């Protein structure tokens, strides 16, 4: 019983100390983070409006205020939110339905306005009419045309609205054709580009002729307060409609500021006073733990079967060999701290010496119990075990015993590229930087065009470029890589990678491609020449005070691109014409418009002086992206795996 009380207390405290990141796949009575107003109710999903009644409004909001921008620097936060929904338009047979729902950001502690049903979407009313009484930005899925403020050229629409019922940007959308289908939405705010984008798709009824993305340039730090409430609002008017929120995921790059909603306080009082209620809740939690544990055991058994199959395939192959955990622990002195080369999100890398091979190796040890780590282990072993190229880190062996997952690579005595560019290791001479750039490009050419399948790496960055004893570049870390057919276009993989290196269309659509890898290569090339990071990381927060691509493009427009050369190179000397060529190729590869980016082969031709240096626009273009789900084949699913650019070695 004491353990149950401790567990229950931990469950109560946990939401108030975590960062701004949550993932709710089911809305039940045990989900305390969500506050409901108006007609909104939770019964597994959130019923924002009841289809059996007219003139209704409902809110479901996150119960803590979310920091949107830093008051000290006025720099906004990147954020992304994913959610799934279902709209019931069954009453279309009676003439119409309405009015839709919206995801909104508004000041903290606001309440559902009175008399805000119908076309007001629960955000406005007759007194404030088309302008909100409080700062407000929202994305609306509007199913009913109100001629006073809605666009007249479409029946229903998806819009991005800035403090007004009139959409700042919109596109047509037909809710009838998607009746009862599950819609899945991604909303992303790129604070560096001030770009708020939304894209959506449907499980069964996606239409290739229908627009499915939208974006709007807005500086949220100029519109909204530093701390906001986020949530959903839906209404019905004289006609009815069912709006259900099925799941919700949110992630932000600023830390959470804790506030306690009054209704949470009341719940705490009730729990504290009612012993019987506490016992019931304890019983419920215990039952839930037992249920989840059994479910986890079943899933683990399936994973074990899958891993066993993979182990057998690897053991039959002629590639990397299998090692015992005992041998690897001995090689790395039981994985002592003084053997640690670097640490990332899913484990650490250690230096070791294998007596059986008489050689130094790097041992990547995945964190125990990490599901993502297991997936990365499987992905990396399956892909890299078949690859052979002088500019790829060579996989020597692997180990899977119980819950331990390890990979053994050739040892890179000169460490990672980022340690030389941004860390304390000796700086790199100009001819070495040129060799590294061409080596990385050669590795990418092999992955994209020369191997039997196209490999999209998805996490090309300076910390994943290793340097051997002769400072040859070796691309590593294939845990996020995906295999694709050469003839297919961008594939839906889910957002993964590192902010600062991810292409804008990849952030907006979640579709990885050879072009998104080329963008990352362009950013790394600019880092190599300038010695500057793609984004700055200060006090644990990502603050793109100077976005490298934007700054370099500005200098290019002024004809001053060469002034950005790494100051360390001015001591040992460099080829100015060659440096300018590398910078322009870097910008070309990091072009915001995916259709204007070169292939890696074209970039290599310019770097080798086999083709002329391209002429780029003097001002950095702003591209928008159309998301169509009809022409792609999904190769992966699941949540986002995103890290932030830093000076750490590896992921």
UniProtKB/Swiss-Prot annotation:
Membrane topology: Single-pass type I membrane protein
UniProt-annotated location(s): Cell membrane
Chief location bin: membrane
Annotated signal sequence range: 1-19
Domain of life: Eukaryota
Ranges for region Legume-lectin like: 20-251
Annotated stretches, region: Disordered: 630-651
Regions of this protein lying in the Cytoplasmic compartment: 291-651
Known catalytic reactions: L-seryl-[protein] + ATP = O-phospho-L-seryl-[protein] + ADP + H(+); L-threonyl-[protein] + ATP = O-phospho-L-threonyl-[protein] + ADP + H(+)
Record: glycosylation sites: 23, 125, 129, 162, 169, 174, 195, 211
Oligomeric and partner information: Interacts with ABCG40.
Biological function: Promotes hydrogen peroxide H(2)O(2) production and cell death.
Protein name (Swiss-Prot/TrEMBL): L-type lectin-domain containing receptor kinase IX.1
Lineage of the organism: Eukaryota, Viridiplantae, Streptophyta, Embryophyta, Tracheophyta
């Amino acid at each position: 019983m004491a353990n149950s009380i401790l567990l229950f207390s931990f469950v109560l405290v946990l939401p108030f100390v975590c960062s701004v990141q949550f993932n709710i796949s089911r809305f039940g009575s045990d989900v305390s983070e969500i506050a409901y107003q108006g007609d909104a109710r939770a019964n597994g999903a959130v019923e924002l409006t009841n289809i059996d009644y007219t003139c209704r409004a409902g809110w479901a909001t996150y119960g803590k205020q979310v920091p949107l921008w830093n008051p000290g620097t006025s720099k906004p936060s990147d954020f992304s939110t994913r959610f799934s929904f279902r709209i019931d338009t069954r009453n279309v047979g009676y003439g119409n339905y309405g009015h839709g729902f919206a995801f909104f950001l508004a000041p903290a502690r606001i309440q559902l306005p009175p008399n805000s049903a119908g076309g007001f979407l629960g955000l406005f009313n007759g007194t404030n009419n088309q302008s909100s009484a409080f700062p407000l930005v929202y994305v609306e899925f509007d199913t009913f045309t109100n001629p006073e403020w809605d666009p007249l050229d479409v029946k229903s629409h998806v819009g991005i609205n800035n403090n007004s019922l009139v959409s700042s940007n919109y596109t047509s959308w037909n809710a009838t054709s998607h009746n009862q289908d599950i819609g899945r939405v991604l909303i992303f705010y790129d604070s560096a580009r001030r770009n708020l984008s939304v894209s959506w798709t449907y499980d069964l009824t996606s239409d290739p002729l229908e627009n499915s993305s939208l974006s709007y340039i807005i500086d949220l730090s100029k519109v909204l307060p530093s701390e906001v409430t986020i949530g959903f609002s839906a209404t019905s008017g004289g006609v009815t409609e069912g709006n259900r929120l099925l799941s919700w995921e949110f992630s932000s790059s600023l830390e959470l500021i804790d506030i306690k909603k009054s209704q949470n306080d009341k719940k705490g009082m009730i729990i504290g006073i009612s012993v019987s209620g506490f016992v019931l809740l304890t019983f419920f939690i215990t039952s839930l733990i037992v249920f989840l544990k059994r479910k986890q055991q079943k899933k683990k058994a399936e994973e074990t079967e899958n891993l066993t199959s993979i182990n057998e395939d690897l053991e039959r192959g002629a590639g990397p060999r299998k090692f015992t955990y005992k041998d690897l622990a001995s090689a790395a002195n039981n994985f002592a701290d003084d053997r640690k080369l670097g640490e990332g999100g899913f484990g650490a890398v250690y230096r070791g010496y294998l007596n059986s091979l008489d050689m130094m190796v790097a041992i990547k040890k995945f964190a125990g119990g990490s599901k993502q780590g297991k997936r990365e282990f499987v992905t990396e072993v399956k892909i890299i075990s078949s690859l052979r190229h002088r500019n790829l880190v060579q996989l020597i062996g692997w180990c899977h015993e119980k819950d331990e997952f390890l990979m053994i690579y050739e040892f890179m005595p000169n460490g990672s590229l980022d340690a030389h560019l941004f860390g304390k290791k000796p700086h790199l001479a100009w001819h070495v930087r040129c060799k590294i750039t061409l080596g990385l490009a050669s590795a990418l050419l092999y992955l994209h065009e020369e191997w039997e399948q196209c490999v999209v790496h998805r996490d090309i960055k300076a910390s994943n470029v290793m340097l051997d004893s002769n400072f040859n570049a070796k691309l590593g870390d294939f845990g996020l890589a995906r295999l694709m057919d050469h003839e297919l276009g961008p594939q839906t993989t889910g957002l993964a990678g590192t902010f600062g290196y991810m292409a804008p269309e990849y952030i907006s659509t979640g579709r990885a491609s050879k072009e998104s890898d080329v963008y990352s290569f362009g950013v790394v090339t600019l880092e190599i020449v300038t010695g500057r990071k793609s984004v700055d990381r200060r006090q644990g927060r990502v603050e793109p005070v100077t976005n490298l691509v934007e700054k370099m493009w500005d200098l290019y427009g002024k004809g001053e691109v060469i002034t950005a050369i790494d100051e360390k190179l001015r001591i040992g000397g460099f080829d100015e014409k060659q440096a300018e060529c590398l910078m322009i190729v870097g910008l070309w590869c990091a072009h915001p418009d995916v259709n204007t980016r070169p292939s890696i082969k074209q970039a290599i031709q310019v770097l080798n002086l086999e083709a002329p240096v391209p002429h780029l626009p003097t001002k950095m273009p702003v591209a928008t992206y159309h998301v169509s789900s009809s022409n792609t084949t999904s190769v992966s699913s699941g949540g986002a795996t995103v890290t932030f650019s830093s000076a750490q070695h590896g992921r």
